[in-house]
């Protein structure tokens, strides 16, 4: 029970209350409660109440009445100060004076700055994109309202591809918009069940952009459009034909989807006039369900490559595998065997790099030496050409010159030695 001396809430109106008096009463109550035995629960609750800061507002007197307002100041939660806290854990002034600071193995200030997810091996670091050619390509893409896989998929080679000389600068155009109907766990392209309708001017604008760049070899890629009846096959066909009409000398590679397993759509694209039919396996069979969208299957992708080759045997068929998901050597070898069985001519190996924290983590950063090993293994198995390196991507322009050479020789009926093809190992893929 509270002592009468602090029962201030029932004061008579004529009583004059001052801030000093309130503080004195609170102090007296605290002392009294601390000395009263046998009242643990009461004293605890009262002590808690009396320790709350009491603030008496200015007293206004009207006649013989006095109105007193007591406010309880609520405790304010301290803001998070991670950087400051980490700094405080670091060397003190005395540590610097005594010289102990230099012996500390880790500086908490530096640890607070670093992002654990930003740590990459040296061979995966690339220069910041810049240069006149880079900005020219970027302006063309913006002006013609085109999407590129270089930007949408956050490709690390964008500076090299866009920033090359006039005869080399290129961008991989992404057709059917910038939004995919699928959601693979490795891909940073936007997803939506119902993307917008394809731009009817996209084929014409794509052909115009490519003709400006003066290229000999171009790569077109596409998002999956499961919302379209034909999966976008006829849109791709129209784009290829417009490019060939504007510049017949240009060799065209199309990296297409699986069209939900509709092989008739594969045949439409294969007969469109393209020169290289590409479709990516992405990973080994065991990991496919965990990495790719559930609508994409390993066997379905093999069927796409087989059908493209059977439809037009003169086509070069191409696929790509990403390493770093936790795949085993035996699984990779089996995948290469499966690819050779369906007549796949070209394979590329690249390192999976996590685009954002929302995507699956990297299990392993594969060394350049291991990439060289897989290049040699694939060439021994009979692939026409293999590009293998940490920064290699399926649409990476460095391999295009070699494939362009092969296609031109074929068109001029100049026979090439398979052994010669296998011995060519471009140093550009040995990136360090």
UniProtKB/Swiss-Prot annotation:
Claim: Metal-binding is one of the keywords in the record: yes
Keyword terms: 4Fe-4S, Iron, Iron-sulfur, Metal-binding, Mitochondrion, S-adenosyl-L-methionine, Transferase
Principal subcellular localisation of the protein: mitochondrion
Cellular component, GO annotation: mitochondrion
InterPro entries the UniProt entry points to: Aldolase_TIM, Elp3/MiaA/NifB-like_rSAM, LIAS_N, Lipoyl_synth, rSAM
Pathway(s) this gene product operates in, as recorded in its UniProt entry: Protein modification; protein lipoylation via endogenous pathway; protein N(6)-(lipoyl)lysine from octanoyl-[acyl-carrier-protein]: step 2/2
Biased composition (Low complexity): 32-68
EC number annotated for this UniProt entry: 2.8.1.8
Location of this chain's protein in the cell: Mitochondrion
Cofactor(s), by name: [4Fe-4S] cluster
Annotated binding of [4Fe-4S] cluster 2, by residue: 180, 184, 187
Catalyzed reactions: [[Fe-S] cluster scaffold protein carrying a second [4Fe-4S](2+) cluster] + N(6)-octanoyl-L-lysyl-[protein] + 2 oxidized [2Fe-2S]-[ferredoxin] + 2 S-adenosyl-L-methionine + 4 H(+) = [[Fe-S] cluster scaffold protein] + N(6)-[(R)-dihydrolipoyl]-L-lysyl-[protein] + 4 Fe(3+) + 2 hydrogen sulfide + 2 5'-deoxyadenosine + 2 L-methionine + 2 reduced [2Fe-2S]-[ferredoxin]
Alphabetized SMART domains for the sequence: Elp3 (SM00729)
UniProt cross-references to Gene3D superfamilies, sorted A to Z: Aldolase class I
Pfam family, one: LIAS_N
UniProt-recorded Gene Ontology molecular function terms: 4 iron, 4 sulfur cluster binding; lipoate synthase activity; metal ion binding
Binding site for [4Fe-4S] cluster 1: 150, 155, 161, 395
Family under the similarity heading: Belongs to the radical SAM superfamily. Lipoyl synthase family.
Protein name: Lipoyl synthase, mitochondrial
Organism: Lodderomyces elongisporus (strain ATCC 11503 / CBS 2605 / JCM 1781 / NBRC 1676 / NRRL YB-4239)
């Amino acid at each position: 029970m509270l002592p009468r001396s602090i029962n201030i809430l029932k004061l008579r109106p004529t009583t004059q209350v001052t801030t000093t008096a309130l503080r004195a009463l609170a102090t007296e109550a605290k002392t009294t409660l601390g000395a009263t035995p046998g009242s643990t629960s009461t004293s605890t609750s009262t002590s808690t109440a009396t320790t709350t800061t009491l603030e008496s507002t200015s007293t206004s007197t009207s006649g013989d009445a006095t109105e007193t307002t007591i406010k309880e100041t609520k405790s304010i939660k301290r803001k998070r100060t991670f950087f400051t806290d980490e700094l405080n854990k670091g060397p003190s002034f005395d540590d610097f004076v005594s010289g102990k600071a230099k012996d500390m193995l880790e500086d908490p200030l530096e640890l607070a700055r670093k992002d654990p997810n930003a740590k990459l091996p040296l061979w995966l670091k690339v220069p910041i994109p810049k240069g006149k050619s880079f900005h020219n390509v970027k302006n063309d893409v913006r002006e013609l309202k085109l999407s590129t896989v270089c930007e949408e998929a956050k490709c690390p080679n964008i500076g090299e591809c866009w920033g090359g000389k006039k005869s080399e600068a290129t961008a991989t155009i992404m057709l059917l918009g910038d939004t995919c109907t699928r959601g693979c766990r490795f891909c940073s392209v936007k997803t939506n069940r119902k993307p917008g309708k394809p731009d009817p001017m996209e084929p014409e604008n794509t052909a115009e952009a490519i003709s400006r760049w003066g290229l000999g070899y171009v790569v077109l890629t596409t998002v999956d459009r499961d919302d379209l009846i034909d999966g976008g096959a006829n849109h791709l066909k129209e784009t290829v034909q417009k490019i060939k009409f504007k510049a017949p000398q240009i060799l065209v590679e199309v990296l297409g989807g699986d069209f939900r397993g509709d092989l008739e759509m594969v045949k439409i694209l294969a007969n469109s006039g393209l020169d290289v039919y590409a479709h990516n396996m992405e990973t080994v069979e065991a990991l496919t369900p965990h990495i790719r969208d559930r609508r994409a299957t390993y066997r379905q992708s093999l069927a796409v490559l087989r059908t493209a080759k059977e439809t037009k045997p003169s086509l070069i068929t191409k696929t790509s595998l990403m390493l770093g998901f936790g795949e085993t050597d035996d699984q990779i070898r089996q995948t290469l065997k499966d690819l050779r069985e369906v007549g796949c001519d070209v394979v590329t190996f690249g390192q999976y790099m996590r685009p954002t924290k929302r995507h699956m983590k990297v299990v392993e950063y594969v060394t350049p030496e291991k990439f060289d090993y897989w290049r040699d293994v694939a060439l021994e198995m009979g692939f026409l050409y293999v590009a293998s390196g940490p920064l290699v991507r399926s649409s990476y322009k460095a391999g295009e010159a070699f494939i362009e050479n092969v296609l031109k020789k074929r068109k001029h009926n100049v026979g090439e030695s398979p052994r010669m093809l296998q011995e060519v190992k471009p140093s550009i893929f040995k990136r360090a």
